[in-house]
From Swiss-Prot:
Binding site for Mg(2+) 2: D97, D101
Underlying gene: FDS-1
Pathway noted in the entry: Isoprenoid biosynthesis; farnesyl diphosphate biosynthesis; farnesyl diphosphate from geranyl diphosphate and isopentenyl diphosphate: step 1/1; Isoprenoid biosynthesis; geranyl diphosphate biosynthesis; geranyl diphosphate from dimethylallyl diphosphate and isopentenyl diphosphate: step 1/1
Binding site for dimethylallyl diphosphate: R106, K194, T195, Q233, K250, K259
Gene Ontology molecular function, alphabetical: (2E,6E)-farnesyl diphosphate synthase activity; dimethylallyltranstransferase activity; metal ion binding
Temperature dependence: Optimum temperature is 40 degrees Celsius.
E.C. number: 2.5.1.1, 2.5.1.10
The protein, known as: Farnesyl diphosphate synthase 1
Length: 346
């Protein structure tokens, strides 16, 4: 897609956000007053449109590649609305995630719950964000033949994501800091459920449903996208430690938070006894000296090179899987996704 076309689609996409926001603050199911309307407006503007919007825009891109031609205004609106549903879902997860992780910044600004007038009201805001998704689906898709499948899809992916978050939280239980619990297979399970389904499978599944496809016939597409999601999360883990905070928009805290990160799992695999001891003694501690010791082990083990090797291998494997797919349109969708994340810096 030419860059001017994608800029045009992005501006249309952003306009749809305003329409959906207006629908929600005028929802007939609730009697809004000025205060509640202003709160919702501020909360939405702060949390929903601030990211890269990759997930949301991917629905529009994917639908366009499946259709193979220009989209009507109605198709642009509907695919954008589905894209925004994913961005809403993402906002709901992040608002609550930041509270659970006691994070400080998100997308280059303070986390929503860190704002003086917000605090724990953010927990209810997260619930509201989650409840906005079915409101949007009902208003704009209720008459569509794929409506029930859409509702099912969002419910299932939300369940998978929340369950992935649970494995992440109980594996990283503070007070039970036991690095020996961490392995590549646990890392993979967390990633698959917590990130891959909603970030990678969901946008393409939305486009496929809108295009009239049966998701049961696209299991292979799901598998490739889950693999892509795993690769994406490994990049994220890498950038948390090695990325520049001003570029990635947040200060990485995976080491302090005792996260089951790809880096620590790889380090444990490659480390000698002394390095393992250093990791066991310092991983998950908040003080800068401990964090520095963990990073020193990462540098000594040359995890940057190990990651680059992983990135190259993953890319090759993904391209091979994609090119095995019988449909050129589906191949284009998957390649477009991979192109967006390969060698990303943020």
């Amino acid at each position: 897609m030419s860059s001017s076309k994608s800029i045009d689609l992005k501006s249309k996409f952003l306009k749809v956000y305003d329409t959906l926001k207006s629908d929600l603050i005028n929802d007939p199911a609730f009697e809004f007053d000025d205060d509640s309307r202003q709160w919702i407006q501020k909360m939405l503007d702060y949390n929903v449109p601030g990211g890269k919007l990759n997930r949301g825009l991917s629905v529009v891109d994917s639908y366009q590649l499946l259709k193979g031609g220009e989209l009507s205004d109605d198709e642009i609106f509907l695919s954008s609305a589905l894209g925004w549903c994913i961005e809403w879902l993402q906002a709901y997860f992040l608002v609550l995630d930041d509270i659970m992780d006691e994070s400080h910044t998100r997308r280059g600004q303070p986390c929503w719950f860190r704002l003086p007038k917000v605090g724990m009201i953010a927990a209810n805001d997260g619930i509201l964000l989650r409840n906005h998704v079915p409101r949007i689906l009902k208003k704009h898709f209720r008459g569509k033949p794929y409506y029930v499948d859409l509702v099912d899809l969002f419910n299932e992916v939300e369940f998978q994501t929340a369950s992935g978050q649970m494995i992440d939280l109980i594996t990283t239980l503070v007070g039970e800091k036991d690095l020996s619990k961490y392995s590549l297979s646990i890392h993979r399970r967390i990633v698959q459920y917590k990130t891959a389904y909603y970030s990678f499978y969901l946008p393409v599944a939305c486009a496929l449903l809108m295009f009239g496809e049966d998701l049961d016939k696209h299991v292979e597409v799901k598998n490739v996208l889950v693999e892509m999601g795993t690769y994406f999360q490994v990049q994220d883990d890498y950038l948390d430690c090695f990325g520049a905070p001003e570029v990635i928009g947040k200060i990485g805290t995976d080491i302090e938070d005792f996260k089951c990160s790809w880096l620590v799992v790889k380090a444990l695999e490659l480390a000698n006894e002394e390095q393992k001891k250093t990791l066991h003694e310092n991983y998950g501690k908040k003080d800068p000296a401990s964090v520095a010791k963990v990073k020193e082990v990462y540098h000594t083990l040359n995890l940057q090179a190990v990651f680059e090797d992983y990135e190259a291998t993953s890319y090759k494997k993904l391209i091979t899987s994609i090119e095995n797919h019988p449909s050129k349109a589906v191949q284009a969708v998957l390649k477009s996704f991979l192109g967006k994340i390969y060698k990303r810096q943020k």
